């Protein structure tokens, strides 16, 4: 669902499980949010952006396709 976010995670070589652990989010919660079953909060989006150390805007990083 979040193609840009998915590609950035893959490019950095980070597993979703590791990212979830590092940002303090339950792995299943992260998967549900990334699949569109629930939405990311602004704080979660900012936290993920900072974790990935991305210059990409939040809007672009979390654009839905």
Regions inferred by a protein language model and the residue ranges of each:
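Short alpha-helical "recognition helix" segments of helix-turn-helix
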Residues: 18-20
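Short C-terminal boundary/hinge segments that cap the last helix of small helical domains
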Residues: 52-65
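Residue-level signal for the short linker/turn that defines the boundary of a DNA-recognition helix
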Residues: 13-14, 40, 56
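A short, Lys/Arg-rich alpha-helix, primarily the initiator
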Residues: 1-15
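Recognition helix of helix-turn-helix/homeodomain-like DNA-binding domains
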Residues: 25-40
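Residues in the recognition helix of alpha-helical DNA-binding motifs
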Residues: 8, 22, 33
């Amino acid at each position: 669902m979040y193609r840009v976010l998915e590609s950035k995670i893959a490019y950095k070589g980070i597993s979703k499980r590791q990212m979830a652990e590092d940002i303090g989010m339950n792995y299943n919660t992260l998967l549900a949010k990334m699949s569109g079953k629930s939405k990311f909060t602004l704080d979660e989006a900012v936290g993920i952006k900072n974790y990935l150390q991305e210059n990409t805007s939040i809007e672009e990083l979390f654009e839905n396709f």
